[in-house]
From Swiss-Prot:
Record's protein name: CAAX prenyl protease 1 homolog
Active site, UniProt feature: 285, 366
Catalysed reactions listed for this entry: Hydrolyzes the peptide bond -P2-(S-farnesyl or geranylgeranyl)C-P1'-P2'-P3'-COOH where P1' and P2' are amino acids with aliphatic side chains and P3' is any C-terminal residue
Residues where Zn(2+) binds: 284, 288, 362
Lineage summary: Eukaryota, Viridiplantae, Streptophyta, Embryophyta, Tracheophyta
Role played: Proteolytically removes the C-terminal three residues of farnesylated proteins.
GO molecular function: metal ion binding; metalloendopeptidase activity
Gene: FACE1
Organism of this sequence: Oryza sativa subsp. japonica
One GO CC term on file: endoplasmic reticulum membrane
Xref: InterPro entries: CAXX_Prtase_1, Peptidase_M48, Peptidase_M48_N
Cofactor note: Binds 1 zinc ion per subunit.
PANTHER family xref list: CAAX PRENYL PROTEASE 1 (PTHR10120)
Enzyme class: hydrolase
Amino acid sequence: MALPYLEAVLCFMILMYIFETYLDIRQHRALKLPTLPKPLVGVISGEKFERSRAYSLDKSKFHFIHEAVTILMDTTILYYRVLPWVWKKSGELATNAGLNAENEILHTLAFLAGVMIWSQITDLPFSLYSTFVIEAKHGFNKQTIWLFIRDMIKGILLSILLGPPIVAAIIIIVQNGGPYLAIYLWGFMFALSLVMMTIYPIVIAPLFNKFTPLPEGVLREKIEKLAASLSFPLKKLFVVDGSTRSSHSNAYMYGFFKNKRIVLYDTLIQQCSSEDEIVSVIAHELGHWKLNHTVYSFVAVQLLMFLQFGGYTLVRNSKDLFESFGFEDQPVIIGLIIFQHTIIPVQHLLSFCLNLVSRAFEFQADAFAKNLGYAPQLRAALVKLQEENLSAMNTDPWYSAYHYSHPPLVERLSALEDADSKKEN
């Protein structure tokens, strides 16, 4: 007797929706609290708190609607076997276009084109509302509708350019991988990730934002001095025009081996009240590098990817699995999609565990910056960024533990103060 794979997947999807909605309700209640957490009283202004509260509540209400629509569409698509219908119709369209639908690569590309069109249509209303209603209402959106459309078109063109060769390579590997399929798939994805990590900041990111060298001055001198003191191989220091799209701020680093680069959002420079606050944020980021957090995270992702491909090889020829989802044939891309659905429970658990590790890394990077003497500046910068980004001040502990990759502000400030107290004692 065939196992009810589809029914099990649908059941877990609904259970996870109920569980995550419960967490969302807890968070919504926390956001409605009319007072600041005690540690933030006197630190965050009342005006910023009210603005943050209003922004967070608007996003929370929007999230409830988006998630409800998403689970309704996803369960409908699976229950009514929409994917097998799309697969069949995409083959017919490919044939009508003069293509050979017997060629799995061509058939798959036609199928994915249909999926992409559907995804764009269903995501567009939510994206427009989020950007031009919620973000605009609270003073964050800086995009015009034409810039929004231009970015969307660029994203679609990149998918059309990069997607087909990647999909074709995966299909060929699966068809010819034999007993070492998991190794070949992982090797390909490992190489692809290295290539994308290399070309994204150099080729792709500049298509959407303008990167300019940080001008000579006190800030540049302090960052270069900090990098040199840590033997960080800083080659280039950029400012990105994030303000053309949003008032949100950030900073990050990238690059391999001796070719490291640091990128500052222009909004970060505008929002921090001193160069030392900005440098403290960079000290935190360099802490991730010095403590090998980036390497550990990359290795963990690669290991999980290899295990995932190993699991896929065990079920890719399961006729019962494909039939449960309504497929008579066993196309490679469909097998991967079905497998992703069957391991949803494991993915949720792993996501939770990775968030735990990520939060631990954030505490360690904060402590690293503090040990360099930037504790006061980092506290001030964290508070400033929390205020300017209107991030949630009150958070439910269950919600933050499950969803947050970064600790809430209260916990980060408390950890920095505890570190100071231990040092004084």
